Amino acid sequence: MIIKRDYYLKKIIDKRENGRIKIITGIRRCGKSYLLFNLYQEYLLSKGVKENQIISIALDEIDNLEYRNPFRLNEYIKEKTKNRNQIYYIFIDEIQLSVAVSNPYIDSKEENVTFVDVLLGLMKRSNLDIYVTGSNSKMLSSDVLTQFRDRGDEIHVNPLSFAEVYDLYENKELAFEHYNVYGGMPYIYSLKSDEEKAQYLKDLFKKTYIKDILERNNKIGRAHV
């Protein structure tokens, strides 16, 4: 199933190669990764960009755990983008999973190295066009703008609008009925039964959103949710 997200795709396209870090934010499971790794990547390929010019790193994959370390992430990207005469598109998914590590030169927690330091350094290279996705309590809009010191462009993605869901259905009355009941989380529209859809939303709310809200407000830790 292909879900068109033309409104957000255009926003990304308009910011292509603008010398700034593109930060795609939004609640979990709203379609950020699909927008970047599917729709935008397909757009770039259709415009003549070669596959080896797109460097994709998903930090939620077990094979990429080492790149949650900012130093390893920096090394990996530099290794993959040695040709300074070629434009590279850097896609990093779930950037909030990156961890702060000690600065080997300064013994102070206030000087810990984070993904922000890495990205701000990489953006100075004129042949890199950087895009990241981030969700949960660590990536609120106010935090993003503060962390990137006005060197990033935020693209905030919402769940599917009714217009986007409408295009998925031949039976337009059914489209309205389903959207009215289940809302706009994209994965819902790949599930067949009402039971599956209801359970998915219940799990998403309990296991994901409640955790983020509580952690953001320092109420309880993960183990007690």
Regions found by a protein language model. Give the residues of each.
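P-loop (Walker A) phosphate-binding loop of NTP-binding proteins
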Residues: 27
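Pre-Walker A adenine-sensing motif
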Residues: 2-19
